[in-house]
Amino acid sequence: MEQLFAKAIHRLNSSEKILKKALAYVNDIEDEIVELVEKKQYGRIKLAMWDCMYNNYRMMVDFVNSEYGTEEEPEERNKIEWNDYLWETENDLRTKIDGAFLLGDSISINRRLDTILKTECTSIFNKGMYSIMAKYCDYAEICGGLESDPCIKCTKYGGKHDIEWIGEHLPPYHPECRCVVKYEPRKQEDNDDDNA
């Protein structure tokens, strides 16, 4: 029992380290994007966003390989699903960023890009963290570290007004403060038609 507990704690500590590394990388990219916006180098912003997502994905793969070894490495089918998700996310990001450039003045663009960055760029890491820790560890709710109480501004409207969903796999955020209103990992519903 003690060995199992120690192993779970080790996995928890490892996931915290990898999460901090991912968030630090996102912060670095955020600084780079702010600089690119100031220089109006909008084409390079898309590359920076994609680079951020891809590196988050690579960190998750490295985490699985180093922590659990090749025997417990995700199946090939799961790797293909990850790659498909990467491309889908990139295409979705391109659409969102293009839309941000077409709307409003520079302040509006900066706000929209900032929101996209803080959500979309970490979605791959968050999704991977929950799926991996749910499979290997009982501390998934701790390892994710995504849930928080809504702010006063959100509570005032009961979490129902001025709330936006930014990204398919992410919780709703207030567009101004971007706090998490409510977060419950989404579960894929079984298709009754397929099971019939």
Descriptions of predicted regions:
Residues M133-I163:
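Aromatic/histidine-rich interaction motifs
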